[in-house]
Amino acid sequence: MLKNVVNRVSGRKRLAKLLGLSLKQEGDRQFLLDMLPKGSVGAEIGVHLGDFSQEIIDIISPGELHLIDPWEHLTSSIYKTAWYGGGAKGGQVEMEERYASIRERFYQCLHANQVKVHRGYSTDILRQFPDQYFDWVYIDGNHLYEYVRKGLELSFQKMSNWMGT
């Protein structure tokens, strides 16, 4: 998870060096899937259409996977290129369709209680879980610094110690 966060930060090579991390090519998430334990309890913040969620299910076969996303169209100019802003030409209607597609795509996993879909902001949703509930949290939601920072702080509180947190 830390490598993924570092990959998204300006000056990531320097930050990775300070943290003692070696980075793979940007966009390569396979290394994350390889290091996450099978049967673990995890959360994905920022689900979009569920493509990475599907990879998590297929490769990790988590005991529980919590998919967290507000599926909300944001109209502020700072989101003009984001898939949840200007990139969603259909506005909130498109977001409702994306949410419905997630529920349909993971229908069997939902009914097997392997996947749980939470619609809302990650900070609000994560607060509903006890501390150290998750084995891992994958953060790929709102990419603005303040939101990433809040997500990281709360995620570390909600994760167990398997990754040394």
Where are these regions (language model features)?
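Class I SAM-dependent methyltransferase Rossmann-like catalytic core
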Residues: M1-G39
